[in-house]
Curated annotation (Swiss-Prot):
It is an enzyme of class 3 (hydrolase). Belongs to the TRAFAC class OBG-HflX-like GTPase superfamily. OBG GTPase family. This is GTPase Obg. Signal peptide: none annotated. The lineage of its organism: Bacteria, Pseudomonadati, Pseudomonadota, Betaproteobacteria, Neisseriales. Monomer. GTP binds at residues 166-173, 191-195, 213-216, 284-287, 329-331. An essential GTPase which binds GTP, GDP and possibly (p)ppGpp with moderate affinity, with high nucleotide exchange rates and a fairly low GTP hydrolysis rate. Plays a role in control of the cell cycle, stress response, ribosome biogenesis and in those bacteria that undergo differentiation, in morphogenesis control. Its cofactor is Mg(2+).
Length: 386
């Protein structure tokens, strides 16, 4: 199935049913009062996050969604039936904006999340509501309200813990194949990856993380060159970026340092926040270098690029904010085990910090709530009797 990560749809909530003007008419009751019921409310439109839906392709073909209208009221105090709601299932990670105002309507971050994106109109009032001491036989009633109608822009941002970025043919797809069960296309030409791929790396029965691989970037990507600029948004939700660099390019005219700097520059142009995310350097294809030249080549690259070199003892107890560098061969699995364990250790620390912060916020909220609920004890003067 083609990967579709953007769509534009029109949603229309149902109109509320009209209220009715009616009077009670029964045998032996010649002057029955008003008994007109209200109209039913219009159906609303909801967006529902579904982990079984992977793309927005359905919304490229069906662009208009209309909820059911409410039924009109009836006599004998009968209210109209409300219109049925409709639910639009979307992938987890979908962001919904109002296309006209740019307002954020919903951000679907977890399975089962349900957000109203168009509210149904209220039903009209029947004449039973207008009865008064001075108006015993009201004939007025109100029409139902129109439901919300809006044009929405849907944008899918994949949810992953780690994002891969680099030039085309840097070996990102080969890496994700080597450490996960994902099987993206791999070939010896640029732009083999045409859409984002996700791979789950399982360390044991309880610990795992998700890697996102996007099409390779080229210089000018932030302005629209190449394929990767469309998919950079998929890296915005990741917690760690792996900058994959081909340390041994076939073309002698290709400068790995220049290419690495170009990627960082495109990242900065696209999104300052994305540029500021934790980023590790992964030097791939070291198997293409003679063994006696590897250390010298890597050291020369890091010096020219201006990236700090790690000491041998940095593998344990590393600072999660410190930049790191790994040399691997994704094709031969050389160094990939050490890299995945380092990623898992990093994510364990980050997740533990996030849980700790969430617990602290919950405790603060509970304390504030208790402070509001608990009434202050009345002051007792010294002269009062016990």
């Amino acid at each position: 199935m083609k990967f579709i990560d953007e769509a534009r749809i029109e949603v229309m909530a149902g109109r509320g049913g009209n209220g009715v003007a009616s009077f009670r008419r029964e045998k032996f009751v010649p002057f029955g009062g008003p008994d007109g019921g209200d109209g039913g409310k219009g159906g609303s439109v909801y967006a529902v996050a579904d982990e079984n839906v992977n793309t927005l392709v359905e919304y490229r073909f069906v662009k208009k969604y209309l909820a059911q209208h409410g039924e009109r009221g009836r006599g004998a105090d009968c209210y109209g039936k409300g219109g049925d709601d409709i639910e639009l299932k979307m992938p987890v990670g979908t962001v919904i904006h109002d296309a006209d105002t740019g307002e954020l309507v919903a951000d679907l971050t977890h399975h089962g999340q349900r957000v109203m994106i168009a509210k149904g109109g209220k039903g009209g009032l029947g004449n039973i509501h207008f009865k008064s001491s001075t108006n015993r036989a009201p004939r007025q009633c109100t029409p139902g309200e129109q439901g919300e109608q809006r044009t929405l822009k849907l944008e899918l941002k994949v949810l992953a813990d780690v994002g891969l970025l680099g030039m085309p043919n840097a070996g990102k797809s080969t890496f994700i194949r080597s450490v996960s069960a994902a099987r993206p296309k791999v070939a010896d030409y640029p732009f083999t990856t045409l859409h984002p791929n996700l791979g789950v790396v399982r360390m044991d029965d309880t610990r795992s993380f998700v890697i996102a691989d996007i099409p390779g970037l080229i210089e000018g990507a932030a302005e629209g060159a190449g394929l990767g600029h469309r998919f950079l948004k998929h890296l915005q939700r990741t917690g760690l970026l792996l900058h994959v660099v081909d340390i041994a390019p076939f073309d002698p005219d290709v400068d790995p340092v220049r290419e690495a700097r170009a990627i960082v520059e495109e990242l900065k142009k696209f999104d300052e926040e994305l540029h500021g995310k934790p980023r590790w350097l992964v030097l791939n294809k070291v198997d293409m270098l003679p063994e006696d030249e590897r250390e010298l080549t890597v050291s020369a690259f890091l010096n020219a690029y201006g990236w700090p070199q790690e000491r041998p003892d940095d593998s344990l107890g590393f600072d999660i904010k410190a930049p790191r560098v790994f040399t691997i061969s994704a094709l031969n699995h050389e160094g990939t085990r050490e890299l995945t364990f380092a990623i898992m250790s990093y994510l364990d620390v980050v997740r533990a910090q996030a849980r700790k912060e969430a617990e602290a916020l919950q405790q603060q909220a509970a304390a504030a709530k208790q402070k509001v609920i608990m009434p202050e004890a009345p002051a007792v003067s010294e002269g009062d009797d016990a």
